[in-house]
């Protein structure tokens, strides 16, 4: 007879996806748990590489980083060996918040000499940085599309290959769609319904590009393209070309004179959020929940 162990989760608590500890069920915790699942299921980090609420030391301060990641071969989980730091906040905390925004993340990264990557998210906004040194010896934080996966392949961050597209898992597709929809609403000034329709156009382009076998994927935006207006316009031109094919195939949904109305900066951001996923192969129940 199989001995099945039953875990009873106390009311108001959740069981942490990585370390199994009970934590308070809060809006901030929901964001962290979603990110933890993505780290393991999509980025393929092992739970042994990840530490939750890791205490940092700089000066007299001892703040706790929400999530830190070490190399898979790291045997000493010390502050000097941290490679990635992730800060998760509830939706109401803005990235520009002086105490809990991206500046907090950058201060944590600065205190960890070998930490190259950092991510800040509140479930609606996401900011990713790679730490470096400029020609004057100053610490700089460069915007990136995403943190690297466990294999460390940076090329996949900028232009994923067809065979490397990832299936979305659990609430992550909903999480991504929500982030994109909010970005349109805030940055393009569109109300929820028009914002959804613009996002729908981009999703149709993503699926159309996935179907275009065996040609290389054209639905992508590199970190460099996202960072300047010329690159953003290049992305818009590339995606608009895909949308021309979408309109021909789905004439009952889109008019012949329809176009993607998003600001190039917003479009580049949304493309960079969606480009890593395989929407065609993602489980239908997950897609249904997200849509």
Residue ranges and their predicted role:
Residues 26-30, 185-200, 280-285:
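Structural motif
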Residues 204, 208-291:
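Long recognition/docking surfaces used for binding and targeting
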Residues 36-37, 198-210:
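Short, hydrophobic/amphipathic alpha-helical patches that form generic packing surfaces
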């Amino acid at each position: 007879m199989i001995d099945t162990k039953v875990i009873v989760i106390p009311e108001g608590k959740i069981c942490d996806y990585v370390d199994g500890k009970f934590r308070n069920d809060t809006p901030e915790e929901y964001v962290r748990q979603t990110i933890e699942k993505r780290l393991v299921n999509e980025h393929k980090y092992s739970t042994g590489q990840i530490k939750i609420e890791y205490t940092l030391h700089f000066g007299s301060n001892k703040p706790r980083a929400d999530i830190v990641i070490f190399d898979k071969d790291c045997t000493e989980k010390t502050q000097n060996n941290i490679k990635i730091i992730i800060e998760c906040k509830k939706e109401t905390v803005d990235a520009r918040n002086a105490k809990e925004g991206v500046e907090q993340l950058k201060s944590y990264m600065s205190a960890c000499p070998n930490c190259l990557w950092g991510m800040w998210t509140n479930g609606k906004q996401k900011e990713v940085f790679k730490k470096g040194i400029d020609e004057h010896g100053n610490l700089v934080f460069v915007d990136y599309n995403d943190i690297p996966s466990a294999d460390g392949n940076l090329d996949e961050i900028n232009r994923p290959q067809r065979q490397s597209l990832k299936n979305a898992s659990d609430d992550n597709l909903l999480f991504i769609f929500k982030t994109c929809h909010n970005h349109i609403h805030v940055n393009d000034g569109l109300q929820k319904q028009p914002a959804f329709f613009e996002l729908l156009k981009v999703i149709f382009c993503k699926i159309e590009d996935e179907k275009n076998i065996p040609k290389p994927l054209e639905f992508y935006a590199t970190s460099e393209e996202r960072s300047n207006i010329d690159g953003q316009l290049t992305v818009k031109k590339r995606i608009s070309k895909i949308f021309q094919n979408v309109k021909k195939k789905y004439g009952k949904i889109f008019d012949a004179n329809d176009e993607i109305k998003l600001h190039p900066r917003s479009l580049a951001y949304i493309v960079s959020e969606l480009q890593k996923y395989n929407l065609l192969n993602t489980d239908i129940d997950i897609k249904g929940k997200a849509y």
